[in-house]
């Protein structure tokens, strides 16, 4: 007791502090790295009918893989054999068996572009292995509407690029500021959208060397539509290319800019 009053020496009740839950912050996106200045060129599916016009007379109505007939009846042989029109050359498969006979000009273009559509509707891609003395081709499955790249992945207009694998790793997401904000030509579902600059490296090519990339644009008409005044593509001759790993993403088979980068 103190001063006639009893002192309460009971210790105060402990103060309970509620536990604080720890929230783990998402890992920061990897920093974007500049890859340097690149020359950007373009490639597309070359259409036999658009390039060659009507098939030369004598080529059996213009079917891509039909041949002119040569009759041997005049020399006593009751036999009719097929022979290609003199200005046509074969597009061989990997077994060196002709898939079609086409003009030399179309053969040269489809070898350079990598993908072509024949008059009969078949889509052909350059094959990676060939022992025929000239480029070989294979028929592209119908569900791959735009062909395939060197990686085996489907090409997508305005999103797929061909690169030199010694400079850019296959499968890399890239960001090209020169494309960002440009409206792409073509109907909705193919083009008709404002580009966000995101592309992916899925293809290669014999003509792609060093700091060069080739943007797949689908059709020749879309390539022409990307030209500036006077039909010039000079705007693409020297463009900045960045790693897109922190800005671009692929979800559900679609390539787009990440929400954080919008």
How should these model regions be labeled?
Residues 2-262:
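Solvent-exposed, well-ordered loop and adjacent helix/strand elements within mature globular domains
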